[in-house]
């Protein structure tokens, strides 16, 4: 997976493919219909649940974490491989779909479990809890599924003319790897691992942040009311939110920034490795040391942020300078910084703004 690949010519080539071809503004624009259609399906599902199960007060309990997870996973799967397995709508329900749902849910479950051997490596041979065995089994099943997708895409390419407007990420990767030096790595392995890391990272980050954003708004009703008033003023009540509206939703942008500040999806970021001995703030750091940046602490530093533990989107409206989340301002780096900046930042922000705006506007 290129996210954990050391800096090298191979990493540079793979990063170039990911940033300039898979997650470029043009590619995201071509696949805009995927985001819009999945958002519409989810809103219809949510309304259907409400209309069937509402009580006398007109309220109904909904597990939004699962809804956000299914929504983002469907969007990412369609963009990566043209597949749709989760939620309602026209989701497949054949054997492949059921298998894929089971495997991906198991993957995300294992992704968050506490493994004793991570803290006490000498106990690894015991495999306490059976997690290592489960991870190996899940990894093998995931590889089989993605291998099937890859073979399916190859057959489709060989039997029809290419249509660039209908290409998903796997189609793009099949073309892109022909023209780059993979430094001895197998092309199929590179394509599969890249697609898998895009699915895993894209789904988890967006789903987690949407859950936190909604939770924060429900616990701060004044901010919720202000966001809905902005939506009524910008969008109105006669139509649904469009992506073209998002740039005009200033307060909504502040809500997303404040959510990313308080609850960054990767609270310790992506680990970095020192390639040479150096001195940082008076401390000697030897070559090979792994570095983790504590984003949780950085984003709640009282020297930088006033009332750092409070949810106050207004702080981003009243700052003397605009602070973005794209790695230009080191006090707020939820997506990382430098050449290891998350390549999916544009996609992530588009999804966060579109889903939250549509949800608040509709309900």
Curated annotation (Swiss-Prot):
Tree of life domain: Eukaryota
A matching Pfam family: p450
Give its E.C. classification number: 1.14.-.-
Give the induction text. Answer: Down-regulated by methyl jasmonate (MeJA).
Q: Would the keyword Glycosyltransferase be found if you checked this record's keyword annotation?
A: no
Would the keyword Heme turn up in this protein's UniProt record? yes
Matching entries from PROSITE patterns are given as:
CYTOCHROME_P450 (PS00086)
- Which PANTHER family does the record associate with it? CYTOCHROME P450, CYTOCHROME P450 82C3-RELATED
Stated family:
Belongs to the cytochrome P450 family.
**The protein's role, per its UniProt record:** Probable heme-thiolate monooxygenase.
Q: What is this protein called?
A: Cytochrome P450 CYP82D47
Could you tell me which species this protein originates from? Answer: Panax ginseng (Korean ginseng)
């Amino acid at each position: 997976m290129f996210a954990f690949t050391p800096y090298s010519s191979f990493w540079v080539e793979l990063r170039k493919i990911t940033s300039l071809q898979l997650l470029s503004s043009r590619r995201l624009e071509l696949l805009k219909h995927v985001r819009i259609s999945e958002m519409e399906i989810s809103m219809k599902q949510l309304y259907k649940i409400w209309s069937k199960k509402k009580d006398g007060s007109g309220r109904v309990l909904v597990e939004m974490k699962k809804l956000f997870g299914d929504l983002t996973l469907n969007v990412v799967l369609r963009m990566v491989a043209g597949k749709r397995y989760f939620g309602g709508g026209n989701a497949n329900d054949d054997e492949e779909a059921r298998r894929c749902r089971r495997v991906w849910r198991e993957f995300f479950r294992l992704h968050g479990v506490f493994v004793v051997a991570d803290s006490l490596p000498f106990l690894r041979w015991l495999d306490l809890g059976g997690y290592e065995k489960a991870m190996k089994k899940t990894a093998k099943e995931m590889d089989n599924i993605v291998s099937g997708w890859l073979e399916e895409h190859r057959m489709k390419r060989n039997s029809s003319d290419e249509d660039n407007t209908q290409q998903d990420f796997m189609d793009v990767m099949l073309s892109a790897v022909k023209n780059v030096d993979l430094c001895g790595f197998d092309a199929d392995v590179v394509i599969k691992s890249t697609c898998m890391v895009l699915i895993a990272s894209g789904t988890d980050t967006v789903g987690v942040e949407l859950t936190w954003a909604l939770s924060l708004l429900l616990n701060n009703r004044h901010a919720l009311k202000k966001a809905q008033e902005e939506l009524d003023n910008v969008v109105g009540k006669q139509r649904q939110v469009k992506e073209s509206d998002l740039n005009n939703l200033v307060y909504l942008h502040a809500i997303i920034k404040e959510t990313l500040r308080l609850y960054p999806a990767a609270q310790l970021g992506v680990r970095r490795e020192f390639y040479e001995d150096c001195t940082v703030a008076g401390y000697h750091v030897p070559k090979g040391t792994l570095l983790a940046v504590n984003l949780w602490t950085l984003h709640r530093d009282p020297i930088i942020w006033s009332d750092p533990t409070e949810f106050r989107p207004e702080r981003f409206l009243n700052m003397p300078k605009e602070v973005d989340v794209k790695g230009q301002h080191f006090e707020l780096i939820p997506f990382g910084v430098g050449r290891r900046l998350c390549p999916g930042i544009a996609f992530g922000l588009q999804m966060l703004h579109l889903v939250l705006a549509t949800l608040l506007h509709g309900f």
